[in-house]
């Protein structure tokens, strides 16, 4: 019996040591020690992450999330510039501790972790108002006479290849954006989230959403995290659950999505 208790005690001690070691190696502990939370963000996705041209400061739905998380941790937030093409690589290479919102993607999940989701979007096509009546369905857009613009590194890049396998596809790299190709007349349509599309048609009255029958690819949004750091992932997930219950994300939606 004594031997059984000794083995049980050793197992508990080993488990405690492993847990302590995991915490010490986690980015959570390093963030607390360094006093800063590094957040990779592109700054080009209205209304999620933007850079104010006057102040050069970050603002948006995602910026408020990161700022609130850092405040609850008692640390300062540091925004690290990145692009959609390098977004995943940055969190894997430890250039930042988390990202701003990113669409869930099986390809991204192969190398990076995700938090719980707190929002969802779907894909819609944008075009110039002058082409109203020319395109009325997804099928209309999938033909050799249509040029589709997408931004490198976004989930829309690969989705466009599937949806528009007959069309010509232009891929632009940040800081350029897909919708700018439509504005410049180099593309007939661009594909983005319904969230960004709603903001773009307000910002650029010459643009409109193609009147297709519903969006494509409904996708949850979450933040990218280091895949092997379960301690840090757990902390962020617990924070998201708590903030959801307290109405934080509903407040952000009212603030940023109804403007």
Q: What does each of the following model-derived ranges do?
A:
Residues 25-102, 110:
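Extracytoplasmic small-molecule ligand-binding "clamshell" domains
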Residues 26, 155-169, 209-212, 240-259:
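Ligand-binding clefts/hinges and TM-proximal coupling segments of bilobed small-molecule sensing domains
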Residues 28, 58, 62, 109-121, ...:
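A structural signal for short loop-to-beta-strand junctions that line the ligand-binding cleft
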Residues 49-55, 66-75, 137-142, 156-173, ...:
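Ligand-binding cleft/hinge of the Venus flytrap
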Residues 120-124, 198-241, 258-259:
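Periplasmic-binding protein-like
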Residues 129-146:
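Flexible hinge/capping segments at coil-to-helix
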């Amino acid at each position: 019996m004594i031997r059984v208790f000794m083995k049980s005690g050793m197992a508990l001690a080993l488990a405690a040591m492993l847990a302590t070691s995991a915490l010490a190696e986690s980015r959570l502990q390093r963030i607390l020690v360094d006093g800063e939370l590094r957040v990779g963000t592109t700054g080009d996705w209205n209304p999620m992450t933007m850079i104010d041209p006057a102040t050069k400061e970050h603002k948006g739905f995602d910026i408020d999330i990161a700022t609130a998380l850092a405040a609850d941790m008692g640390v300062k937030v540091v925004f690290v510039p990145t692009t959609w093409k390098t977004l995943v690589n940055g969190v894997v290479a430890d250039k930042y501790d988390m990202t701003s919102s990113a669409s869930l993607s099986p390809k991204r999940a192969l190398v990076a972790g995700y938090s719980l989701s707190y929002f969802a979007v779907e894909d819609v096509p944008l075009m110039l108002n002058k082409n109203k009546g020319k395109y009325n369905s997804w099928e209309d857009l999938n033909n050799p006479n249509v040029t589709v613009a997408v931004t490198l590194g976004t989930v829309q890049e690969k989705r466009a290849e599937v949806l528009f396998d007959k069309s010509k596809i232009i891929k632009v790299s940040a800081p350029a954006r897909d919708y700018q190709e439509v504005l410049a007349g180099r593309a007939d349509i661009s594909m983005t989230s319904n969230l960004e599309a709603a903001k773009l048609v307000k910002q650029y009255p010459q643009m409109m959403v193609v009147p297709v029958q519903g969006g494509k690819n409904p996708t949850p949004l979450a933040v990218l995290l280091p895949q092997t750091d379960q301690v840090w992932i757990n902390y962020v997930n617990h924070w998201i659950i708590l903030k959801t219950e307290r109405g934080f994300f509903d407040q952000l939606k009212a603030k940023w999505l109804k403007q």
